[in-house]
Curated annotation (Swiss-Prot):
Organism name: Cupriavidus metallidurans (strain ATCC 43123 / DSM 2839 / NBRC 102507 / CH34)
Keywords: Ribonucleoprotein, Ribosomal protein
One Gene Ontology cellular component: ribonucleoprotein complex
Segments crossing the lipid bilayer: none
Database matches in InterPro entries: Ribosomal_bL28/bL31-like_sf, Ribosomal_bL31, Ribosomal_bL31_B, Ribosomal_bL31_sf
Quaternary state and interactors: Part of the 50S ribosomal subunit.
UniProt name for this protein: Large ribosomal subunit protein bL31B
Protein encoded by which gene: rpmE2
PROSITE patterns for this protein: RIBOSOMAL_L31 (PS01143)
Coiled-coil segments on the chain, per record: none
Length: 86
């Protein structure tokens, strides 16, 4: 194997910000933030959805539109979709 071409594979703490769930797994993600968890310092990756908050895994319906994507879609295509149904 060549030296210096492979990404750094290390333990990273992922933080699901929607429900404050944290878990440690190995990843090559590049982050600037760090956090202390159970006496160790880990690189921190903030995520919006994990298995603890996704409706498929939790069995609950929840609107997860944090960026306003649905409203943008309705503004852009709302009148066109209504005319196409007639």
């Amino acid at each position: 194997m060549k030296e210096g071409i492979h990404p750094n594979y290390r333990e990273v703490l992922f933080h699901d910000v929607s429900n404050d769930f944290k878990f440690v797994t190995r990843s090559t993600i590049q982050t600037k933030d760090t956090i202390e968890h159970e006496g160790k310092t880990y690189p921190l990756a903030k995520i919006e959805v994990s298995s603890e908050s996704h409706p498929f895994y939790t069995g609950t319906q929840k609107i997860m539109d944090t960026a306003g994507r649905v409203e943008k879609f309705r503004q852009k295509f709302g009148s066109k979709l209504g005319a196409a149904k007639k």
